[in-house]
């Protein structure tokens, strides 16, 4: 796993530093270089041409009066290009930052100029402020290593296939509803035969093309169901036998009652399997569960959670919190929630479950990092060897 991102203010070494900001697009990358003396050089290279980018870096060092061994500090905004460029730059000795684009400050005018060049100049200005020690000018993205990013695709593929499966079922139900038909079971090996036997309200057979549409939709549903079953089996095998860091942590999480193998795998691959956290606030911030206070003059209120982090994890945490109340009723967390919110209304309970989710997240972190089982929680029996 790669080391943590360089801290603000740690990149200026003896004045021999080349700063580089990248504006990435589908066809062309715009590159802006700057030296500590304030000199600048702007160039363009073909997208994904790392060799050409390295040549421009060498040329910029010469033109800006820096030595060939000068350190290079670069940045680009996180987006569709992912993290491969970050790994390529670091493999060539460049200190790179991947920046959360939503954290970059923008003018609040009704209309503002927006061009790639203006964005590039803005990015360079923020980079220079960051290296001077202004850590809060933006948020730096934590980049997973290649293995952690790869194993994360498994849980995301399963989620994507679940969505496709649901859409096919909904489409079939909608087509049948237009004919006044409702079925308890959709799909199956005999789906084509069952479609041919369906009858409208007056006993007549379905139209030829409607039957064809239903059969084709059923075939697509069967393909997705098969792929989904195969990926789930692979996930369960990894959780049971895998030696990767994410698999080991998923296995430990699955020992807790109320957390199934599916949830534990998502927790491990998205959060605990590759990231490290210094404190509870940093942990809660990673999934958008930190508070957002508002205080101006005499007005002061809480605006709710920030929702600035991983949405998948935040959604799953709330689901797990409800499961925790059901399957871990004697735990300290469940008793805390029941004592305060059991007799409140529906809206208050929905708000309160987020508080439980935040406490549960911290408890799971302590369990994985320090082996501290949540107070009163029950563990599942280990399978016999």
Question: Which residue ranges define each predicted feature?
Answer:
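Gly/Thr-rich phosphate-binding beta-strand-loop-beta motif of the actin/hexokinase/Hsp70
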Residues: 9-34, 123
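Short glycine-rich, Thr/Ser-proximal phosphate-binding strand/loop in the N-terminal lobe
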Residues: 26-52
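Short, basic/hydrophobic alpha-helical segments
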Residues: 50-73
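Short alpha-helix plus adjacent loop in nuclease-associated cores
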Residues: 97-140, 194-195, 299-308
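Glycine-rich, often acidic, oxyanion-interacting loops/wings at catalytic, nucleic-acid
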Residues: 149-252, 381
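Phosphate-backbone recognition surface of nucleic-acid-processing proteins
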Residues: 249-349, 384-385
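Low-complexity, acidic/Ser/Thr- and charged residue-rich accessory regions of DNA metabolism proteins
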Residues: 298, 338-385
């Amino acid at each position: 796993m790669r080391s943590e991102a360089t801290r603000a203010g740690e990149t200026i070494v003896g004045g021999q530093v080349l700063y580089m900001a990248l504006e990435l697009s589908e066809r062309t990358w715009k590159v802006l270089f700057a030296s500590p003396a304030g000199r600048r050089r702007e160039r363009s290279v073909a997208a994904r041409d790392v060799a050409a980018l390295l040549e421009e870096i060498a040329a910029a060092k010469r033109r800006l009066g820096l030595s060939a061994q000068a350190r290079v500090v670069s940045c680009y905004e996180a987006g569709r290009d992912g993290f491969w460029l970050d790994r390529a730059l670091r493999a060539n000795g460049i200190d790179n930052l991947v920046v959360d684009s939503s954290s970059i400050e923008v003018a609040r005018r009704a209309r503002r100029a927006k061009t790639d060049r203006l964005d590039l100049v803005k990015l360079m200005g923020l980079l220079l402020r960051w290296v001077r020690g202004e850590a809060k000018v933006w948020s730096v993205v934590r980049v997973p290593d290649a293995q952690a990013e790869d194993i994360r695709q498994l849980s995301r593929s399963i989620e994507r296939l679940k969505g496709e499966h649901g859409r096919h079922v909904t489409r079939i139900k909608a087509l049948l509803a237009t004919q006044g038909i409702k079925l308890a079971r959709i799909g199956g090996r005999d789906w084509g035969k069952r479609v041919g036997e369906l009858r409208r309200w007056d006993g007549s057979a379905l139209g030829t093309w409607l039957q064809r549409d239903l059969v084709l939709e059923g075939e697509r549903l069967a393909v997705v169901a098969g792929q989904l079953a195969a990926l789930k089996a692979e996930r369960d095998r990894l959780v049971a036998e895998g030696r990767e860091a994410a698999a080991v942590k998923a296995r430990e999480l699955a020992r807790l009652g109320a957390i199934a193998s599916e949830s534990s795998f998502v927790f491990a691959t998205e959060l605990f399997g590759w990231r490290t956290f210094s404190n509870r606030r940093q942990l809660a911030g990673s999934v958008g569960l930190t508070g957002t206070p508002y205080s101006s003059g005499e007005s002061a209120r809480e605006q709710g959670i920030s929702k600035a982090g991983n949405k998948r994890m935040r959604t799953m945490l709330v689901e797990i919190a409800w499961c925790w109340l059901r399957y871990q009723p004697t735990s300290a967390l469940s008793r805390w929630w029941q004592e305060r919110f059991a007799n409140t209304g529906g809206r208050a309970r929905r708000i309160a479950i987020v508080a439980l989710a935040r406490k549960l997240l911290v408890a799971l972190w302590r369990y994985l990092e320090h082996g501290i089982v949540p107070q009163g929680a029950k563990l599942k029996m280990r399978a016999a060897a």
